[in-house]
Structures are given as C-alpha cells and as structure tokens.
C-alpha cells in the first residue's frame, strides 16, 4: 500500500476512536459524575439534546468515512431495544442508498481480481451501478460469447467490492475493538450489553460479507434448496 494510503487509514482509525472516546467521556461526565454532585435533574434535562447531537455527529462521520462505519450506523439504527429514538431515527437515514465509488477505480479492482481485462470477460458491462452499498456495488453485464456458451446464459449481475475495502474493514474493526474495550470498563454499560462480544459477532459477519466466494457458495446452496418440493398435506382426506 502507498504512503498516502497508510496515512488515510491511520487518520480513519484516529477519527473513529476519537469519536468513541468523546462519547464515553460525555456519558461519564453527565451520567455518572454530575448526578453524584446533586445535578442529576439538570443533567437529565439536557440528555435528549446531547443524544441527538451525538447521533448527528456519528451520522456525519459515517457518511464521510463510508465503509464499515455505514454498516455500524445501519445496525445501531435497528437497535430500538438498546437505543433511544433520538439516536435510531437519526441513524435510520444511513439505510438509504450509499454514493457509488468511481467506476475507474472499480475497474482496476475488478480486473486485478479476475486476472484479465473486463472487456475479455464481458461482452458489455454497465458503468453505472444498479445498486451501491457500503462494502460493494453491482452492475449489469453480459458474458463474453465463449463464457456465455459455457455457462448457458449471458445476462449477469457483477458484484464488485469497493476499492481497498478489506483494509478499511480491518482498520474499522480495530478501532471498534478499542472502543468496545473502553465501554466494557463503564459499569452501567457493561451490565446492559457485552459490547466486545457484539463487536466480534459484527466482525464475523463483516468478513463473511467481503468473502464473495463464501457468498457464492451460500447462493448455490440456497438455489439448490429451491430445486426440491415437500409433501403437501390434503386436509379433505386427512
């Protein structure tokens, strides 16, 4: 990886951990320290405003950084069992479409993975994605004649990872593990959730999502399941 690439990843790590630490310090000061000094009611009155402000800051951070941070925000927006509506409502905007990566960068990434020019693998390939997500995006394409004859079909959807996403996932998870370690030392948070365990589960599913061979295998297994039928009971003769 180039020196600028390393600098971007280091900056990314610092921004994520700085945000995490700032939220932890805010919780420590307003929800632990001030209530012990007789200012519990004053602290409580400002809680909604603080939560909303923190959610807005995270949404902006996730939108700017992209990658796994978008998925973190999408995941948190569904946790209405753990987070107040001020947070989940703000983060729900991250469920919308994600801006697509530049096709020139995607082409380089795809050709490196395939080991051949895209023009050799495909008779045609759209340059505008039909879907863009935090970790990858998809394009309509037609297989080259020889490959189409071998496969038995020509029209395909090509799913390509965002350039450099594997390194981004590694860095983001490293930052999230650091933050989870800090949160595990905050008693009332640790009593409510095993944050390090949640991060590890999130890491497992994230790595599965960027393992397209694993995904292809799962798609094959799902397709094979549809080849079978099960007995259908008839109530009138039962």
Model region roles, listed by residue range:
Residues 155-160:
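Glycine-rich ATP phosphate-binding loop
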Residues 191-210:
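Non-catalytic, low-complexity flexible loops and terminal extensions
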Residues 228-235:
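Conserved small/polar residues in nucleotide/adenosyl-binding loops
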Residues 146-154:
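Short, solvent-exposed loop/turn segments that connect beta-strands within catalytic domains
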Residues 1-137, 147, 173-197:
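N-terminal accessory/targeting segments that precede structured cores
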